C-alpha cells in the first residue's frame, strides 16, 4: 500500500540522515586532513543544493509537499550537523539547475552505475 511504502521511506530517510550526519561530524571534527576533505566535498556538492528544491511535475500532486516548502527544514538540519562538526555549509552562489528537466552531465551515468551495482550483483535481494 502507499501508506506502507511511505512508512518505510520515512524510516529509510531517518536512517540515512543520521548515518550521513554522523560521518560529517566524525570527519569535520576529526583530523586537519579529514576536515579539509569534508569541507572540499561540501563545497563541490553545494552547487546541487538548489536542484533539491526545484519544482517538477510531481509537485502538482496535492498529496506531496512542495519542495520549496522543505528547504528551511533541510537548511536547519544541515546547519546543525555542520555546526556540530565545527564547520559551516554555504550553498553555491552559482547553482546547477535543469536536472528535473532531464539536463544531466556525464557524471550521472557513473553515479547511477555505482548506486545500482549491488542490486545488479544480487537481483531480488532484500534487507
Put a short name on every predicted segment.
Residues 36-127:
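Extended, helix-rich structural scaffolds rather than catalytic motifs
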Residues 3-62:
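A contiguous pocket-lining binding segment that forms or flanks enzyme active sites
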Amino acid at each position: 500500500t502507499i501508506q506502507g511504502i511511505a512508512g518505510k521511506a520515512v524510516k529509510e530517510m531517518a536512517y540515512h540522515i543520521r548515518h550521513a550526519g554522523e560521518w560529517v561530524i566524525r570527519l569535520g571534527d576529526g583530523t586537519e586532513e579529514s576536515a579539509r576533505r569534508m569541507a572540499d566535498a561540501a563545497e563541490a556538492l553545494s552547487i546541487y543544493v538548489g536542484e533539491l528544491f526545484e519544482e517538477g511535475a510531481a509537485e502538482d500532486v496535492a498529496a506531496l509537499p512542495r519542495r520549496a516548502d522543505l528547504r528551511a527544514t533541510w537548511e536547519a538540519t544541515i546547519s546543525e550537523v555542520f555546526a556540530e562538526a565545527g564547520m559551516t555549509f554555504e550553498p553555491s552562489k552559482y547553482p546547477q539547475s535543469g536536472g528535473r528537466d532531464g539536463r544531466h552531465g556525464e557524471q550521472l551515468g557513473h553515479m547511477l552505475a555505482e548506486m545500482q551495482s549491488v542490486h545488479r550483483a544480487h537481483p531480488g535481494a532484500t534487507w
